[in-house]
Amino acid sequence: NGFLGVGPDSIQLESLLKKAQKMGKKTGIVVNTTLTEATPGAFYAGVTSRKESYTIAKQFTESGVDVAIGAGLSAFINRPDSVDLTATLIEKGYNVYLDWKSVLKTSSDKFVGILSMGDVHRRNKSSNTTAGAADGAEVCLAAKLAAGSEENADTTRLSEPTVYLEKATAKALEVLSRNNQQGFFLMIESAIIDGYGHNNDSDGMIEEMKEFDCTLKQLVAYVNQHPETLLVVTADHETGGTGVTYNSFEVGNPTPLKLSFSTKGHTGTVVPIFAYGAGAEAFAGIIKNTDLPKKIEELMK
């Protein structure tokens, strides 16, 4: 239906991020797509269409998030109302960085990094920038993949996985942990796994999972060092009907793994949920996806 952060009556719902803020916790968002995409947007915005990136960007400036790192500058500056929302963020006390080096070097406790899509995802180095059909916001290949666009991903050369998500996560953890006795809520999204599922791109999905795995190893290490922390990893849905088909292989002759797909859309397949750290036992068994935020909220109290 395209609704984002609102109920059937179009009234905005209170997200986990907002509830964490009410508890006095710091909050952060790290994504390898635009900050106004559906998943990050759902944690701070309330609109009747996920395509309303200009409205979502405006609501981001009112979100109170302490740290945010992602892409999507166009929705903040190339706007129909001619308002420069980066200036609005600065007026609200944020440091705003538009390049990766500044994000890595900053010692600020409150900042927003709005980077190029080429900075946040390896497959955008040579991709063409196009106009979004809905609102004219700039969208590169990764954003189109995340939105489920049909793209011939096989023609895009794979490079080694970047370390963007891992480093951006490390920076967010550094800032949110600093001088903080109340704890924090951090939402991290590896957005393009879904896009490769839509495109039935086995190589892309495998490489993206490798990069995500590096980020998860870092998060597990953080939990080990801060045992009062809870790490929850899951997905909102499965994409592509992904599987590994039966095959015969010659012993001693390594064969690259190829995933199989049954659709280019989302499926109703049950998705896993992994929890580690304080309160992880609450996530055993089969859980309704609408119960997950309730469990997390209780454990944050």
Regions found by a protein language model. Give the residues of each.
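A post-motif C-terminal structural segment
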Residues: N32, T36-K301
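Mobile, glycine-rich extracellular loop/lid and propeptide segments
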Residues: S10-E14, K18-Q21, K25-T39, F60
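N-terminal carbohydrate-binding/catalytic regions of secreted carbohydrate-active enzymes
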Residues: N1-G7
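Short glycine-rich loop/turn motifs that provide flexible caps or phosphate-binding loops at active sites
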Residues: L4, T27, G268
